[in-house]
Amino acid sequence: EAGCQEALFTLGDKPELRYTQARHELERLGYETTIQYLVAAAEAVRDATGLLPHANPGVVSRDELLALRAVCPSQGMMLESVSRRLLEKGNAHYGSPDKDPEVRLETMRWAGELRVPYTSGILIGIGETREERIESLLALRDLHDQYGHLQEIIIQNFRAKEGTAMAQWAEPSLDELLWTIAAARLMFGPRMAIQAPPNLSPDTFGALIQAGINDWGGVSPVTPDHVNPEAPWPHLDLLAKETEAAG
């Protein structure tokens, strides 16, 4: 009734390896891994609703990509950044082995080899330089040039969240976001879908379009953004009006 076509499944990397409660819940439900449960959930939603599942479960193996491919028309994972400097102590990716860019790029490479339609992108404002953003976009472009499987590039601006280690971290400016969108458009050309989450940059829709986006991404009139619950989705009518005004 709301016109939705896709169901997004987004989650952390293999929570059962870190949290006892996650392991116990999987055992109670009759699954050995989170990915097995995700495959079953995606299949159930697809069959019951007709919505197309999009899986974003983080770093996965080739076999897990194949299992998800059977029930999900598309998959995805943010590269975030190729900067290994961010893995060092005191930086954004310290203590997060699944944020290692080589590990993430390997999963994306397998997705290309397996012809899995894939969404990726970068996260800006986490301590990276402009040069490192370009290097990250180049890594994604190289993958796409080889496999042709990237269907969308996301330029996402960091938003500080209470209760996290980066709660006091300064958020990137609008100028930095627009610069990065423009760089991505120049690098990927006119055919690539490039998006920036509209709920993370309210009241700037025209500027985002002029910088180079041509896709608003997944915007739900039914559910909140569970990753960024403090940032409500803009109304679809407003997005349509702003898009039309920008030509």
Cite the ranges covered by each PLM segment:
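Conserved Radical SAM active-site core
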Residues: 1-145
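Auxiliary Fe-S-binding modules of radical SAM enzymes
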Residues: 47-49, 112, 134-247
